[in-house]
Amino acid sequence: SSYLFELSQTSKVLLMAKKIIVHAGFHKTGTTAIQSSFFAARNELSKAGITYPEVGGKAHHKAIYSLMGKTWGWEDRGGVLANDKKWRDFVKQVKRAKSTALVSSEFLCELTEEQIVKFKNDLGCSDIKIYFTLRPLLKIIPSAYQQHLKIGIKSNYEKWLHSILDEPGVSTITPSFWVRHMHAEVLAKWVKHFGKENVVVIVVDEKQPEFMY
């Protein structure tokens, strides 16, 4: 029985990426373009020993929604509450990577500490690097407002600005804004669980936006 136990543990080690690169945000920092590039280059990445898992779409949002237990789509327009199946399937894909797995979703920046711990434990890899792309908040705000308009908020720009800036950290109209954009707090949570040596911030150069590619 001890032999079988050792064999099962060995198989678990074999079914694991040697390294995982995680692009965790932030929102409105060119993430969609980056993810489109990853998706378009997945065959080339594979030849280089990097696996970019597929879960529907060019990014890994559905897997992260599954981890978070969030509703995929608009709640009042037929959105579906995610169960953990997508996340479990995604983890299997990551662990099957022969060398390096690449994970990308800006919704990772919204994880609670408990969810970050689960993310880390489920992936089960000792070599994980977390990358965040960052732009000045002043550049993010107009783009964030446009995004919120797409999902149905009715407030005009001035009213919305007051809702997020009168009391930074609190937003009565779009609560997710500060969950996503209290950048220092988000970074602190990831540093706490992965170590500062494993969390990298890349500041987007507005004059040379293509440098990220």
Language model features: what each stretch is:
Residues 44-46, 113-213:
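PAPS-dependent sulfotransferase catalytic domain
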Residues 106-109, 175:
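The substrate-binding groove and active-site-proximal loops of carbohydrate-active enzymes
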Residues 1:
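Conserved small/polar residues in nucleotide/adenosyl-binding loops
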